[in-house]
């Protein structure tokens, strides 16, 4: 047990509409009959008036009297954790919410790249009826993948790809068993890990060890018919090296949900590349995202109020 932190008012910070509108999340929480807590959408300047704040991003105002901050993402690289500790502010994140959702998106991207579905969509807009060359589409169940990062996102992704019949290896700093994996490599062995994979899927969190992890040497180690899928963070890839690998046909293509700069600038080369699928950091989007966040927030309001340990405590 930890000390009780009565959470009676929670501000849902105004962050826009994605991945779930704040007003929708407030309505979901208001429908809970098991909580003695008021939920209100709040601005940054109003945050200090609340016992807890639910947010997408950190703001320094959260450190001025707030007992608890909940991050609706799993990633927290932009949160100053030492400041939270120094201020005795509990910080929790949303690990466990997005794993299945991202895995579904990765599955869709794998099938899109394998079958060339993005090409057909492009042709539809031009009213063109044209099949791909006979050898271009390939059978996913006879191919292989390497999932880099086997935490929440990677574990769910590896399991889903295994269901498709793929041979799946992984890369992680920890020894990981189960998940239908073949071999699990240490990050120092990433070039060996990706060398036989038709798909290299990036699901690792961003930190100092993973920033720039996937560079030109990794692309050189990949098969020429391999595809990169990135649903983690753009900074994990050395973007200039990826552009060069795509332009020089060192790899077959990519599906990219995350980038160095977001929104992706209009002059970014990826927009014009026929062998690249661009999605707007949307891999975790689903109509149930808000319900999952509401359940987690409600659980932590109850736990903090009664002296329990909150789920997904980071600080």
Task: Give a label for each model feature.
Residues 1-90:
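An N-terminal-biased, well-structured beta-alpha scaffold segment characteristic
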Residues 7, 141-145, 216, 225:
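Phosphate-coordination loops involved in phosphoryl transfer and adenosine-cofactor binding
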Residues 89, 95-144, 309-314:
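Phosphate-binding beta-alpha-beta segment of Rossmann-like dinucleotide-binding domains, i.e.
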Residues 92-93, 97-105, 119, 262-315:
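C-terminal helix-to-coil terminal segments
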Residues 148-151:
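Glycine-rich Rossmann-fold phosphate-binding loop(s) that bind the pyrophosphate
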Residues 163-180:
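NAD(P)-binding Rossmann-fold cofactor-contacting core
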């Amino acid at each position: 047990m930890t000390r009780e932190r009565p959470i009676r008012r929670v501000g849902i910070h105004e962050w826009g509409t994605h991945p779930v509108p704040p007003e929708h999340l407030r309505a979901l929480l208001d429908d809970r009959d098991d909580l003695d807590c008021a939920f209100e959408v709040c601005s940054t300047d109003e945050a200090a008036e609340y016992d807890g704040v639910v947010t997408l991003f950190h703001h320094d105002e959260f450190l001025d009297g707030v007992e608890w901050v909940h991050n609706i993402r799993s990633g927290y690289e932009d949160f100053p954790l030492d400041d939270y500790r120094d201020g005795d502010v509990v910080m929790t994140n949303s690990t466990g919410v997005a794993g299945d959702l991202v895995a579904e998106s990765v599955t869709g991207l794998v099938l899109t790249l394998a079958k060339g579905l993005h090409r057909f969509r492009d042709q539809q807009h031009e009213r063109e009826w044209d099949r791909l060359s006979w050898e271009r589409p390939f059978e996913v169940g006879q191919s292989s993948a390497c999932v880099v990062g086997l935490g929440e996102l990677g574990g769910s992704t590896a399991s889903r790809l295994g269901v498709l019949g793929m041979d799946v290896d992984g890369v992680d700093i920890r020894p990981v068993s189960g998940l239908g994996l073949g071999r699990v490599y240490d990050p120092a062995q990433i070039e060996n890990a990706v060398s036989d994979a038709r798909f290299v899927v990036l699901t690792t969190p961003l930190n100092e060890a993973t920033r720039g992890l996937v560079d030109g040497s990794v692309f050189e180690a990949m098969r020429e018919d391999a595809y990169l899928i990135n649903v983690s963070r753009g900074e994990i890839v050395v973007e200039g090296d990826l552009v060069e690998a795509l332009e020089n046909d060192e790899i077959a293509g990519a599906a990219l949900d995350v980038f160095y700069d977001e929104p992706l600038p209009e002059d970014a080369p990826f927009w014009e590349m026929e062998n690249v699928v661009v999605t707007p950091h949307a891999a975790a989007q689903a109509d149930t995202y808000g319900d999952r966040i509401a359940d987690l927030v409600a659980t932590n309001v109850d736990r903090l109020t009664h002296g329990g340990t909150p789920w997904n405590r980071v600080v």
